[in-house]
Amino acid sequence: MKFAVIVLPGSNCDIDMFHAVKDELGEEVEYVWHEETSLDGFDGVLIPGGFSYGDYLRCGAIARFANIMPAVKKAAAEGKPVLGVCNGFQILQELGLLPGAMRRNKDLKFICRPVELIVQNGGTLFTSSYEKGQSITIPVAHGEGNFYCDDETLERLKENNQIAFTYGGDINGSVSGIAGVVNEKGNVLGMMPHPERAVDELLGSADGLTLFRSIVKNWRETHVATA
């Protein structure tokens, strides 16, 4: 399986994402600069965290206009796995690929520490190697990770089982404790916690590696079945 790690001005987690895929999983991965216009030849797309374009106007608001973004939307429409982490999640919201918006954390402080997540949906291509209800430890690093949506959208997320992860406690004020959501097709995931920073027990947790393994496992099963 071949992954693309999108690199934007201000990305700062692209190297961690690359390491998780290449060094921990042993899969193919390439950096793709934001000025590129095609993602043909890639099987999965990873949008890392950071502060794209300095978070000016609004987190992800300028990044949505990057040359590569139409190709990201095309990959999502084709059913390829697309993962956006932290700022990547915000960008996916700005692109309209995921619902909701991000507000400042409730205490207006930047949070940077390991947190407990609860797996709410173990049936997606990103979470199938977890158990529903499983408690995992993944670090967060954000100042604007307070997920917000209106009541109608929240009800739809619950009905469609689109809530992938919730926080084990109220760390930032997110509606219903939401930490990550998938689109209706289940091939686009946005999450504020950083799974790429939890791929080695030396760092305190390897729970994030399971997410990447899930992606690869599902891709291989699908492609072997259709070969």
UniProtKB/Swiss-Prot annotation:
Catalytic site positions: 86 (nucleophile), 194, 196
Places the protein is found: Cytoplasm
Catalytic activity: N(2)-formyl-N(1)-(5-phospho-beta-D-ribosyl)glycinamide + L-glutamine + ATP + H2O = 2-formamido-N(1)-(5-O-phospho-beta-D-ribosyl)acetamidine + L-glutamate + ADP + phosphate + H(+); L-glutamine + H2O = L-glutamate + NH4(+)
Pathway: Purine metabolism; IMP biosynthesis via de novo pathway; 5-amino-1-(5-phospho-D-ribosyl)imidazole from N(2)-formyl-N(1)-(5-phospho-D-ribosyl)glycinamide: step 1/2
Main localization category: cytoplasm
CDD domains named in the record: GATase1_FGAR_AT
Single Gene Ontology BP annotation: 'de novo' IMP biosynthetic process
Glutamine amidotransferase type-1 domain boundaries: 3-225
EC number: 6.3.5.3, 3.5.1.2
Molecular function terms, GO-annotated: ATP binding; glutaminase activity; phosphoribosylformylglycinamidine synthase activity
SUPFAM superfamilies: Class I glutamine amidotransferase-like
InterPro entries hit by this protein: Class_I_gatase-like, PRibForGlyAmidine_synth_PurQ
Keywords on record: ATP-binding, Cytoplasm, Glutamine amidotransferase, Hydrolase, Ligase, Nucleotide-binding, Purine biosynthesis
UniProt-listed Pfam families: GATase_5 (PF13507)
GO CC terms of this entry: cytoplasm
Function: Part of the phosphoribosylformylglycinamidine synthase complex involved in the purines biosynthetic pathway. Catalyzes the ATP-dependent conversion of formylglycinamide ribonucleotide (FGAR) and glutamine to yield formylglycinamidine ribonucleotide (FGAM) and glutamate. The FGAM synthase complex is composed of three subunits. PurQ produces an ammonia molecule by converting glutamine to glutamate. PurL transfers the ammonia molecule to FGAR to form FGAM in an ATP-dependent manner.
Quaternary context: Part of the FGAM synthase complex composed of 1 PurL, 1 PurQ and 2 PurS subunits.
Protein name in the entry: Phosphoribosylformylglycinamidine synthase subunit PurQ
Gene behind this protein: purQ
